[in-house]
Amino acid sequence: MLRVLGLAGMLMSFNIHAAMISPVSGVKILFANGTEVDEPLEPMEVDAKSAQLVVRYAAELGSGSNQKVFDSAPFVITIDNLSEDIKLYPPKVFSYEQANREFNTSPKWRIEGVSGKEISYSQEKLKGNEGFMPYYGMEALIAKHNEERGIVFSAGVVKAEVVTTDKMVEKPATTKNADALVQLQHWYKQASTEERKAFRKWMVDQE
């Protein structure tokens, strides 16, 4: 049986609530209900009673000479009951080493509604590719993740908070039509610090 998220799952409801989802303190929302998010650090609206968020945490941790930039792997967070505006907080970590330990298993995100109530969720670490650049082509990885679990979405369930005509015109119709340079730039922006270092090292080795 398919697990349906989004508008299709709410045919029995006459009132669809558009919930605002706000990432906090270094949380990036990369995809929402299968749709790529243009501004990962900005609030967005989701027109559905449930949401699947692909998120990543990035922040400078530590102090002084021990300060380092930490980038987590992407995690798939599922919220089954999205009945109010929410804020998504990262786990409380204060050093690079602590963050490594926290995100190595099941990080403790905190999702809080405007009512002050803590919202329940489930999560899985997104499975990447083997070897170099494990999260290159993230859209395909998410599609595979959802296909394996029988998860489907209705079209148009996600709206950016602000969408301008210029942005709609400039955005490529499909990733497949983008040339290799655009795809590399797209991957580089989403890559973690360690992935970027590995990519730069690989580039030097090719020269």
UniProtKB/Swiss-Prot annotation:
Q: Where is the signal peptide?
A: 1-18
Q: Which UniProt keywords apply?
A: Signal
Glycoprotein among the record's keywords?
no
Organism this protein belongs to:
Vibrio vulnificus (strain CMCP6)
Q: What is this protein called?
A: UPF0319 protein VV1_2115
Cite the Pfam families for this sequence. DUF2057
The family classification in the record reads:
Belongs to the UPF0319 family.
Report whether Acetylation shows up as a keyword of the record.
no
